[in-house]
Amino acid sequence: MDVLYSLSKTLKDARDKIVEGTLYSNVSDLIQQFNQMIITMNGNEFQTGGIGNLPIRNWSFDFGLLGTTLLNLDANYVETARNTIDYFVDFVDNVCMDEMVRESQRNGIAPQSDSLRKLSGIKFKRINFDNSSEYIENWNLQNRRQRTGFTFHKPNIFPYSASFTLNRSQPAHDNLMGTMWLNAGSEIQVAGFDYSCAINAPANTQQFEHIVQLRRVLTTATITLLPDAERFSFPRVINSADGATTWYFNPVILRPNNVEVEFLLNGQIINTYQARFGTIIARNFDTIRLSFQLMRPPNMTPAVAALFPNAQPFEHHATVGLTLRIESAVCESVLADASETMLANVTSVRQEYAIPVGPVFPPGMNWTDLITNYSPSREDNLQRVFTVASIRSMLVK
């Protein structure tokens, strides 16, 4: 894997810097590394593809070295280099695709394609000169079963979940109280509602709670907490739990009271915040508990009182909500996030070449399914294919 990264890094630098008019002295070190790559690869043969519709391709290497010059690189020099670069880039691209479409239930962190296994041989280590990628660093750690650490921006840690629970319901669905939520990606939105605006509740207050368990532990997380849930701020028609009918939700937004968010690890509270909004941090957690209250306003103008009458019909429904968004965090496991295209890269290649469903990944690389059942086998395979996708993205956008 590290050899594949070094190949890609060398080729990227060569493609960017070996251009007509450049002083040879400015790229002499790069050309020396480029020639070392050619020397190491010459005389070797590889085969890629042969799974799904990914075609079988045979690769052989017999290239001349780039020479030295005292002056600028001319058009002939650059054209010779380009022919070599293009072949190598095509080879790396196909090795990456061949690796990204394969999976294994055992030791899925290790190379699975014949071509990448061959590149792992000792003689190709002479190519290896650069392992500065976070993915390569963590792949090496995971391969040795040591602790890894990925930094993510808006990590997709929450499987998609959109539902509701009713703490009070009636057959006519005209006086409901409960909670509805939408968890997806890096964001939780939860709303508590009471059609009667807590008129018969103790102290005219309704208590709500929403607990979310993560599939992986996050550390040093920067989080945004807001006293609102905008996705639940407009009228909608909702299917009943049994699917037999529908009910109408017409929210009027109030500010939540006594808001508390707890971050827990193995059932122990690590961080707690009360009535604190904006940016917060959490050190180490695998569970988030949100609690908040809806309080009937003790003093109301006539216009507000008309929204919340003392008896039915309740045409407007008192609603309070919270939004929790994980902006950045560190995780030992690889995840899809907002700043990278690894999941899309892997999924698109598997779809384009009609790769059959294997023993590890769900059909279509469905992320909700994958993260919901994030087994050690899936973790190993996902880290490997994401690492390869990161290498491929250096050369192929």
Swiss-Prot record:
Localization of this protein? Virion
| Molecular functions per Gene Ontology | host cell surface receptor binding; metal ion binding; structural molecule activity
UniProt record, GO biological process? fusion of virus membrane with host plasma membrane
Task: Give positions of region: Interaction with the inner capsid protein VP2.
Answer: 62-73
The entry describes its oligomerization and partners as: Homotrimer. Interacts with the inner capsid protein VP2. Interacts with the outer capsid glycoprotein VP7. Interacts with the outer capsid protein VP5*.
Quote additional remarks. Answer: The VP6 trimer contains a zinc ion located at the center of the molecule. The zinc ion is not essential for either trimerization or transcription activity of the DLP. Zinc-depleted VP6 has an increased sensitivity to proteases.
The name this protein carries in UniProt is Intermediate capsid protein VP6
Species:
Rotavirus A (isolate RVA/Human/United Kingdom/A64/1987/G10P11[14]) (RV-A)
